[in-house]
Amino acid sequence: MSWFEQRAGLDGTVAVVTGGAGGLGAAIVEDLAANGVRPAVIDLDDAAVKELRDVLDKQGVDHIVTQGDARDPDALTALFEQVDERWGRVDTLVNIVGGTFRAQFVDTGAKGWDAILRTNLSHVLHACSLAVPRMQAGGRGGSIINLTTIEAHRAAPGFAVYSAAKAAVEQFARTLSIEVAPDGIRVNNVAPDYVPTPKLASLGGGDSSLSTPEGVRVAIPMGRAGHVTDVSNSVVFLASKLSSFITGTTLHPDGGTFASSGWFNWPDSGWANHVPSRILANATLADATEA
């Protein structure tokens, strides 16, 4: 057994993961499983669920992967009941489910607000209400990890309610972490920034300069886009005993953008937190002309 395996203490533990079948979620589940964790996953995407099942089956992982809506309290309850029957313990909860749409606040209404809050905040409350009593009853402590976003920590024009919901998750986690600390349960957040995934691409809107190396170098101090493993590594760390004295905080696997955050209202293209491609192209052309 390696030093990490000895210190991490993940082998044989059980993790409930909401939204764990695609993109970031699948990377997190697969990395947890690689460290001996038995995952119980709920995800709305039926194709992604089937794909994740196949991957875990081929790896010989003991798992529960079910198609369902984590925003539905009954579906969440059913998943936890399956975990009770199968393994009789919950050691880790990872809340990944999230989503939004881009629109100015004045162009949205109560139906849109409710959908965003239900997706990004309410399901976290339901999942925690199911996980915490089980962790307390188990007497082994536990770790709750919420996937939030850099937008919980800065202005996000076009995403007012989404950023507010994610900020609410952050504050909920801080408060819950204090309430459950005497039980040895830790609560933390992981707030990534730009990690290219199909879901991120589907949001659209604004300029696309972050798809170019030049744009990434301008926007991200470390000079590259994030990888799903940058996020999954953070989750594995927070699930493990290597972080046993860390609670009520947020990890930022973002290449430094939280430290350097700034939104700019570029002429003709509106709000963006990066330099538009047309400006980069003009600058490159000017440099070439001068040369």
Which residue ranges define each predicted feature?
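Residue(s) in the substrate-gating loop at a strand-loop-helix junction
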Residues: 149
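Active-site loop immediately N-terminal to the catalytic Tyr-X3-Lys motif
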Residues: 106, 154-160, 182, 223, ...
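Substrate-binding pocket helix/loop in short-chain dehydrogenase/reductase
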Residues: 104-105, 109-117, 216
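Short-chain dehydrogenase/reductase
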Residues: 244-258
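Alpha-helical segment proximal to the catalytic Tyr-Lys
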Residues: 133, 178-182, 244
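Active-site helix of classical SDR
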Residues: 128, 165, 173
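Canonical Rossmann dinucleotide-binding motif of NAD(H)/NADP(H)-dependent dehydrogenases/reductases
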Residues: 3, 7-40
